[in-house]
Amino acid sequence: MNYDPGPLPAILDRTRLVYSYTNLNCYENVCPYQFYERYIKKSTPFVETEAMRYGTKVHEALEHRIAHKKPLHPDFAQWEPFAAPFDGFHDDTRDKTVPRQALSTELKLGITVKGECCDFFDNANVWLRGKLDVVVLNGFNRAYINDWKTGNSNYEDRFELDVGALMLHAANPHLTTIKGTYTWLKENRLGEMYDLSDTRHAWTKVTGIVKRIERDRQTGQFEKRPGPLCGFCDVKHCEHNKKR
């Protein structure tokens, strides 16, 4: 017999959540109940899919190419035109007349509940954290973020870039201009260029989602939202799960 007692009563739910784009997006754009099962109750074990493994290999290859000039594997050589432009950025602190240009790959960032910068691994204080694929600090007050995507671009949502810009600005409060793109590798194209400079907007959106999560934790009620992704969901006891 499968018996699911449902969400924990608020008085018993003491899980400390560290937020990320991934879990915020799960709650906001996929299903609040899936969010609960995955990130609070943790009833669904993480299973790495073939697509995930492929994405990791691609990210690692591009990181080594950009950060260490290691040639791309022949399987990924078609994406050299997306990596080559980053070769022109440097960090030359010897010539003070040249605006500082710093290039980072797989940059780990974190912020506290007050929106202040903290270490990605500061488990006592980190409230939101994430990893940015490529970051260029170009000059004294400008930055550019790029996010590699190995899937399809059926629907391009800037929220992931906004979350990245929020954390980047916390670490570099002097920044006045932040722009960002997704690179859709499967389609060999660059996505829309977004102006991410208004990080207050991102902060408002993130805190709004968190408030709704905390409300649901207090009531113990997380919406079971039917949608096209139900057929891929690992919460098998949900009545909307097409795998049942």
Where are these regions (language model features)?
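Metal-dependent nuclease catalytic regions and adjoining charged, substrate-binding loops involved
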Residues: T112-C118, A124, E156, H169-R244
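Short amphipathic alpha-helical face segments that pack within enzyme cores
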Residues: K57, F159-M167
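Short coil/turn segments at secondary-structure boundaries
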Residues: R38-K41, T49-M52, H73-Q78, V98-K108, ...
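Catalytic cores of nuclease domains that cleave nucleic-acid phosphodiester backbones
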Residues: A61-I145, P173-T181
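Nuclease-adjacent, charged terminal/linker segments that flank catalytic cores
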Residues: M1-I11
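Nuclease catalytic cores
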Residues: R14-P71, E106-L107
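Short acidic (Asp/Glu) and glycine-rich catalytic loops that position anionic groups and cofactors
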Residues: F35-K41, R142-N146, Y182-G191, K236
